[in-house]
Design a protein with these regions (language model features):
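Conserved P-loop NTPase motor cores
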Residues: 2-111
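Generic alpha-helical secondary structure signal
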Residues: 8, 14-15, 109, 119-123, ...
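Short C-terminal domain-edge/linker segments immediately following a structured domain
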Residues: 66-71, 97-102, 118-124, 160-166
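P-loop/Walker A phosphate-binding loop and immediately adjacent motor/lid segment at beta-alpha junctions
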Residues: 99-138
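Conserved P-loop NTPase motor module
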Residues: 124-178
Length: 178
């Protein structure tokens, strides 16, 4: 918080309303560019219909970029997910979360199997991620921002995914030690 002038540790709709009002004071060409970072703000108290949802559908008009992180993919509302233009997918340890992500974004490359190829190719090292550039049509799939893996259903990379560890699952008969 000390490194940034306008950093908050909570969210209210009023904050977004004030940001929009401050941008509306400018002509479009004079608006300052703004980045809003929302780090895991999605909780049971975060309504799916709020000013963030509105802003995510209109952010281009206000010269704002929005970076939203979450650990629960579907807790992000449909309007926000549908308006996402750049998606970063880190390694998922929860197979159900990965299934939701795969279901949502596999249509950008034509099949769930190809999506999983892109996903596995992107996670070649710790802390790596699959980057989807959804502003392009067809979408472009990258390892980090460095290696183009494919354009839509056209795989560019000649690599084959290595055997990757399966997402972590707790055995049904698991009992934690006390």
């Amino acid at each position: 918080k000390d490194a940034f002038d306008d950093c908050e540790d909570h969210y209210t709709d009023k904050m977004i309303q004030e940001l929009i009002a401050s941008q509306k004071k400018y002509e479009r060409e004079d608006m300052p560019t703004m980045l809003i970072l929302l780090d895991d703000i999605l909780s049971r108290d975060f309504k799916k219909t709020n000013d963030i949802t509105y802003l995510c559908s209109k952010f281009r008009h206000y010269e704002m970029s929005i970076f939203l992180t979450t650990q629960s993919f579907r807790s992000v509302g449909t309007i926000i997910r549908n308006n996402a233009t750049n998606i970063l997918i880190f390694r998922q340890n929860n197979s159900k979360e990965l299934d939701k992500i795969k279901e949502e974004y596999s249509e950008l490359c034509g099949s769930e199997a190809l999506f999983m190829d892109y996903y596995n190719l992107a996670h070649d090292s710790p802390h790596s991620f699959l980057y989807i550039d959804g502003q392009e049509n067809p979408a472009r799939f990258y390892r980090r921002h460095e290696v183009l893996l494919g354009i839509g259903d056209k795989k560019i990379s000649t690599e084959t995914p290595r055997d990757k560890p399966k997402p972590f699952k707790i055995a049904k008969d698991f009992t934690p030690e006390k």
